[in-house]
């Protein structure tokens, strides 16, 4: 599940996080969809920016479905040499865009007019925030790794007012944990 908003959207990704956590997750009408969704990516295709706060309010984020609350996580690709384009993205075997398919998709969405706009041309680049998170998390090898090892189901029981309450939670590993697990796997 990928949702991309326009850059500088009203409220940034914080607005989308509130909408998901306060309206969609608690709504029983969305439950069957949420239950089958393992990975969700939200982006307004902007660089991470906390606007003077601690947590970023714009950028590209990921989470997994949850019954009550799903925290949005940042994803930063490993780039130990601080290169302009992280090595994983620079070396990824991207396919060429088929011009006819591109035109057909734009026609299907009645968006042919955007084809030659500067913003559209910029967004085709491999180093945009949305493309970076999609490449980093949805490349076949990494997506399978995340689905197999990166999602944990936790059943918690606690006493509330003398009664035992049980809650089921689903958590997804943070990007730092993923890189650590991949490094361990490579060493084994």
Predicted regions located by residue number:
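ATP-dependent helicase/translocase motor core
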Residues: 1-188
């Amino acid at each position: 599940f990928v949702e991309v908003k326009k850059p500088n959207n009203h409220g940034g990704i914080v607005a989308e996080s509130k909408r998901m956590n306060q309206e969609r997750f608690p709504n029983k009408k969305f439950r069957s969809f949420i239950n089958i969704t393992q990975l969700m990516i939200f982006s307004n295709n902007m660089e991470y920016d906390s606007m003077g706060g601690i947590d970023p309010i714009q950028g590209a984020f990921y989470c997994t479905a949850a019954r009550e609350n799903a925290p949005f996580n940042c994803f930063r690709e490993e780039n130990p040499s601080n290169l302009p384009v992280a090595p994983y993205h620079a070396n990824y075997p991207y396919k060429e865009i088929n011009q006819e398919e591109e035109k057909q998709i734009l026609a299907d969405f009645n968006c042919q007019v955007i084809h030659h706009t500067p913003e559209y041309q910029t967004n085709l680049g491999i180093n945009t925030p949305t493309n970076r998170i999609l490449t980093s998390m949805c490349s076949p090898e990494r997506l399978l790794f995340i689905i197999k090892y990166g999602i944990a189901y936790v059943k918690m029981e606690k006493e509330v007012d003398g009664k035992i309450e049980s809650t089921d939670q689903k958590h997804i590993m943070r990007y730092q944990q993923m890189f650590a697990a991949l490094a361990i796997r490579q060493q084994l």
